């Protein structure tokens, strides 16, 4: 209960978990090992959603008296700030490892939890080192300073394998997409848009033109080195709620120009494309490629690249009318990205919490809500498919590709690529 009560208090969260704390009429704890959730409506995703939350120790923060009544959370007190979890005494959980030391920008050291309730992990100590630059990260692996690295650069695969190391990779549930401002109007209220007196992204024809202008396969092959999959919806097949017939929009620059002309932009317009340059695989390069493709159809596109921390702060303040970002669906089913990215933004319900373009479609919202309260799995999956098809037909955002996530490992250990892109110490194991 303490965990659920704290979630709405977390400041500056780029992707808040508040959507998972809605809809509870009551939460009861009849004994120390039982928790009973009473919801206002059927909630088929409740166990799945709760599994994404890290459970906090109420005792560590003096929150043992907290309760959840008809009015929501009661007796929370002063919840901890995120920075407090950098202290081992506060980072209390029931997992296979314990936090031994955290030094910002240098390392995180975990030690095996000898009192763990499950199988003991293989490693006595695990050290995580943040190495943001690709070159030093690869060099650390080749020198034997580290055993595993995330996201080795594609161009270094041959060098890494030639030195006797392994590459493992697999498709992820992370969609890379372009989002457009579908809220502000006229143009002077639409940041970065020039050459028009209105917001062009409010016109579906403009959004469709942008989609047709993007050569997704060229991005996959030339920018991503084949280590990505072109996207036609928000999750890759065969995850729950996806449709095999939802193919990527075909590259059609002439069709895109025609749509722009029909929308009243025969000479195009100008826009700034915001992007992080250190968050997603080749993010700035992908943004530059997309900008060139849009410029070719008459939308002069200038790229504004920056660190992820700066980008997300500016994005959350709606400073971009067009931006590149990514979304990973932790739940592994279509409800997650539909709720997060294309449902109408509603702080009261948590719907649309990452819909920074503020697209709104009541018909789509109704389908999403119906799917969210449908317990029958087959019926729910069909509703999600309908919602996905409706959304993609209206171009609320432009799906580009799904990341294929690589890891590089030394010989003698194994790791199986995860669709959620997580690197878990418990799943790195000795082996050939």
Go through each PLM region and give its residues.
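Extended, small/polar residue-biased N-terminal targeting/export presequences
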Residues: 58-59, 80, 395
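Mature extracytoplasmic/periplasmic domains
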Residues: 61-64, 226-246, 405-410
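Residues embedded in well-ordered regular secondary structure
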Residues: 73-81, 85-86
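Glycine-rich and polybasic anion-binding loops at the starts of cofactor/ligand-binding domains
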Residues: 400
